[in-house]
Swiss-Prot record:
SUPFAM superfamilies: NusB-like (SSF48013)
The name this protein goes by in its record: Transcription antitermination protein NusB
Parts forming coiled coils: none
Any GO CC annotation of this UniProt entry: cytosol
Gene: nusB
InterPro entries noted in UniProt: NusB-like_sf (IPR035926), NusB_fam (IPR011605), NusB_RsmB_TIM44 (IPR006027)
Length: 150
């Protein structure tokens, strides 16, 4: 039987970022997702893996399935003189995750996804990167999402 833990969506987004980052560095999808989810849970002593939440798997699978498409959108929205290869792996991973959740994952309102990825950026990067990510992704906030929060 697998263990179940309750996590907030913010925690799961952070775990998705960690898994995607690990995969970008050459890690395996399931192992990266499982490790990111189980990290800090002391399940190593239990020998039973935790059941991965659907939200986490949907984010990781979605970004990986649409990686080329997401990269094209990011490339088109970078300022002149910048290339996606010039971005740090952390920033590139956060941009992919945020862009996926805002444009292709209909469960989350755009502004919520944007705010969440900015908070993760502040934790794993610096203020300059968080502002850069905010600037690039904020143009994808839909008019409908803006109308709800205004």
């Amino acid at each position: 039987m697998t263990k179940r833990f309750q996590h907030s969506r913010r925690d799961l987004r952070e775990r998705a970022f960690q898994a995607l980052f690990t995969m970008e560095m050459g890690g395996d999808f399931l192992l990266a997702s499982q490790f990111a989810y189980d990290y800090d849970k002391e399940v190593a002593d239990d020998k039973q893996p935790s059941e991965l939440p659907v939200f986490l798997l949907n984010l990781v699978n979605g970004v990986m399935d649409h990686k080329a498409e997401l990269d094209e959108v990011i490339k088109k929205n970078l300022k002149a003189g910048w290339s996606i290869e010039r971005l740090t792996v952390v920033d590139k991973t956060m941009l992919r995750l945020g862009l996926f959740e805002m444009t292709l994952f209909e469960e989350t309102p755009d502004r919520v996804a944007l705010n969440e990825i900015i908070e993760i950026a502040k934790k794993y990067s610096d203020d300059t990167s968080a502002k850069f990510i905010n600037g690039l992704l904020s143009q994808f906030v839909s008019d409908e999402s803006a109308a709800v929060t205004d």
